[in-house]
């Protein structure tokens, strides 16, 4: 299973006075089971890119493949794609709307045509996966903490049993404890379910801690793609894009400049 983008381009407002080219010839391939960090400053194109990956936006030019099939081919089942490639938007708790947590998480599976019993079984499993026990089932989602709301929203996507989970800034607005809890749950999903994870973030510290591979976007283009240690070697270029490498990267560089022999593969503490 893989996602493959070939010469992907996207233009907002094409043919109008407000035309804006958001993606330029993006080429990438994401393999089954990878944990990919997608990073870039505001306006870099990362959010536009992920909306292509599950078919919410159609490219202005280029091709996109899922499991070897061109999703732009005639008759392709976009509904099936969106159930396999789950997308959690930034501030997803704003989309919570049901009277209680369990009912809210059941919404996606029911929309897939599952019975009430099947949907509830999926929802309970998803809530367990994000660390919410049965005591939360009948609680109003609006009475939960910010981190708990975020986990309910993620469970709503997991209940649809996607093969790929894309998260757009999943820790935005959370306190440090809430941020760590969310990221640890995502990491656990990757390790225990071998789920493909695409984590969109502007935090180098977060992606260095969890991701196996980093893709850096800037002005709609893919500028770096590789292991964290390879990408962080370009920390001077990253700074020109409004990004900063993890603090440990600067420390290692300073130590080496002062003649101290230290492993420069270190990306986290």
Regions found by a protein language model. Give the residues of each.
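Conserved ABC ATPase signature
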Residues: 140-144, 148
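Conserved ABC ATPase "signature" C-loop
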Residues: 219-220
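Helix-to-loop junction immediately C-terminal to a conserved catalytic motif
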Residues: 54
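Conserved ABC ATPase "signature" region
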Residues: 118-135
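ABC ATPase NBD Q-loop/coupling interface
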Residues: 63-80
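Catalytic Walker B motif of ABC-type/P-loop ATPase nucleotide-binding domains
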Residues: 165-168
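Conserved catalytic motifs of ABC-family nucleotide-binding domains
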Residues: 161
């Amino acid at each position: 299973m893989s996602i493959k983008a070939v010469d992907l381009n996207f233009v907002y407002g094409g043919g109008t006075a407000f035309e804006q080219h958001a993606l330029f010839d993006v080429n990438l391939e994401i393999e089954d089971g990878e944990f990919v960090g997608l990073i870039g400053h505001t306006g870099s194109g990362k959010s536009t890119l992920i909306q292509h990956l599950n078919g919410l936006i159609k490219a202005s030019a280029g091709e996109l493949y899922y499991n070897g099939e061109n999703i732009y081919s005639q008759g392709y089942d976009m509904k099936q794609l969106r159930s396999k490639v789950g997308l959690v938007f930034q501030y997803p708790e704003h989309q919570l709307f049901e009277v209680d947590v369990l009912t809210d998480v059941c919404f996606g599976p029911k929309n897939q045509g599952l019975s009430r019993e099947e949907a509830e079984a999926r929802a309970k499993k998803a809530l367990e996966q994000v660390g919410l026990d049965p005591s939360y089932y009948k609680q109003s989602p609006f009475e939960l903490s910010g981190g708990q709301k975020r986990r309910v929203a993620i469970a709503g996507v997991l209940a649809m049993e996607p093969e790929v989970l894309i998260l757009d800034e999943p820790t935005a607005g959370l306190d440090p404890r809430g941020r760590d809890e969310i990221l640890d749950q995502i990491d656990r999903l990757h390790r225990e379910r071998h789920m493909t994870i695409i984590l969109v973030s502007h935090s180098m510290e977060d992606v260095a801690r969890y991701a196996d591979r980093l893709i850096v976007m800037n002005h709609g283009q893919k500028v770096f793609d590789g292991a964290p240690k390879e990408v962080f070697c370009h920390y001077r270029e990253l700074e020109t894009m409004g990004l900063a490498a993890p603090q440990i990267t600067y420390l290692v560089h300073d130590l080496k400049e002062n003649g101290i022999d230290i492993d420069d593969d270190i990306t986290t503490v």
